[in-house]
Structure formats: structure tokens, C-alpha cells
Amino acid sequence: NKIDWNEIIRISNLFTAEDYHTSKTTPEFNLDLSTWRYFSIDSLFPGKENLIRGKVHSKEALPDGDEYYYIGAKKKNNGIEARCGFDKELISEGNCIVFICNGQGSVGYALYMDRDFMASGDLVLGYNEHINKYTGLFLVTILDKERFKYSFGRKYGKYLPNTKILLPAKDSMTPDWSFMENMIKSMPYGDLI
């Protein structure tokens, strides 16, 4: 298994520095944690319709095709395990936070999915009108910092709704969604997201 350096060089030459040109090179935000508060997952995704389990209970049940991603219980590759066709009964709406609740080694991680997809039954999907690609990335980063609580065989399961995460807040009851969005936008390369 030798590394084909010529192929690596050929591929790297397909991209130029212009492909990654950004005006954002330094963060513009000062993180004042004194305004941050703890919020439970069920307060961020209120109502049973906003925290729902994935619909695919067997990978073999996926329809043939390549229009949609099948997301499984893994962090690598943003959870993508396969591509599949459309099935109205199995599709999950995108623009959500994906909580990995079961599986081998990735329990406790979170993902952000921007498009419709097929979700494993080992996942719980969180929906909130304030979620977008920026707030989604912010939340996933914070949620992944809480992962240590769910290692060594402990699963999200019944603990997920009551899990608390520290977020910027407008007041004790309201997360500061615009701060989260603007912070991600201000990060180096935030304009390329």
C-alpha cells in the first residue's frame, strides 16, 4: 500500500488559493461568558414534534438510488453511511440537529443536516425555527463538548431532553440565536460556509 504522491499532487493542483479566498481572517467577537445560561435540550426543541426519532430501522430497507443521504449513528463524514432513493415514509426533513443516541463509539455526538435525508432509528432529530447552517454549527460544537457524559456505555436515551448546555442568552429563558449566528459568520472563513 504505497502512497501515490503524483496523484495527491495532481488532485491538490485542482484547487487554487482563489478557491478559498476569504475576507475573514480573524474572529470579531469577544466571548463574554457572563451572559451565557444553561438551557435544556427540551427547551431548545420544545414539543414532541420537535424531538423525533429517525425512521429507518434497517439499512436493508432503504430504497435503491442516490438522491438522498442515509445518516447513521456515526460522527465521521457527518454521519453519512450511504446514498439511497426516495421513500416518503422514511424521509426526514433537513435543517435540524441530529443527536446520536445509540451506536458504536459515537453516542453523545451531534450533527447538523441542512437537507432532507433518511435517518437511522438510532438518531433523534431536533427542530427549531431558529436553526440554520450557522446556529446549527454553533450548537453542534457546544453539544459535542458535552459528549464526555455519554461515554463508556451510557447513552442519551432518557437523558437527552434534560441534558443542559451553556449558550449565549438574551435573558434566563431565551437563547441569543443572533449572537450564535453572527459569531459563526465572523469566524475565519465564516463567509465560506
For each predicted feature, which ranges?
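Glycine-anchored helix-breaking recognition loops at helix->coil/strand junctions
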Residues: 1-7, 11, 122, 139-170
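Non-catalytic DNA-recognition/assembly elements of restriction-modification systems
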Residues: 1-78, 171-193
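Sequence-level motif detector for i,i+2 pairs with an aromatic at +2
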Residues: 36, 65-68, 94, 121, ...
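Sterically constrained small-residue positions within well-ordered secondary structures
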Residues: 61-62, 89-90, 116-117, 154-156
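A short beta-sheet element
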Residues: 80-137, 141
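A generic structural motif
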Residues: 129-130, 167-173
